[in-house]
């Protein structure tokens, strides 16, 4: 098996595991980690496709996605902490609206 195909299969597996975590889990922190897993799967696919094409565009875009993901984690974790302090729990199925 070609190494690029293995990278693409791994990236699809990472994305699907992350998607399953977003759909199944109710803990907000686990959903946030699953979202990051999905983004890492996309990044791996971008870098693998970039290796096939022999360009650096995919690597630059993957770096940009990592930067945006870091900001997403900071904002998401801040919201989760605020919800936990306000409501006393962090389960996503029990929080239906942000306003009281």
From Swiss-Prot:
It comes from Aquifex aeolicus (strain VF5). GO terms for cellular component: NADH dehydrogenase complex; plasma membrane. It comes from the Bacteria. NCBIfam families: PRK05715.1-2. Belongs to the complex I subunit 4L family. This is NADH-quinone oxidoreductase subunit K 1. Its EC number is 7.1.1.-. NDH-1 is composed of 14 different subunits. Subunits NuoA, H, J, K, L, M, N constitute the membrane sector of the complex. GO terms for molecular function: NADH:ubiquinone reductase (non-electrogenic) activity; quinone binding. GO terms for biological process: ATP synthesis coupled electron transport. It is found in: Cell inner membrane. The chain crosses the membrane at residues 3-23, 28-48, 60-80. Signal peptide: none annotated. Keywords: Cell inner membrane, Cell membrane, Membrane, NAD, Quinone, Translocase, Transmembrane, Transmembrane helix, Transport, Ubiquinone. It catalyses: a quinone + NADH + 5 H(+)(in) = a quinol + NAD(+) + 4 H(+)(out). PANTHER family: NADH DEHYDROGENASE SUBUNIT 4L-RELATED (PTHR11434:SF21), NADH-UBIQUINONE OXIDOREDUCTASE SUBUNIT ND4L (PTHR11434). InterPro entries: NADH_UbQ_OxRdtase_chain4L/K (IPR001133), NUOK/Mnh_C1-like (IPR039428).
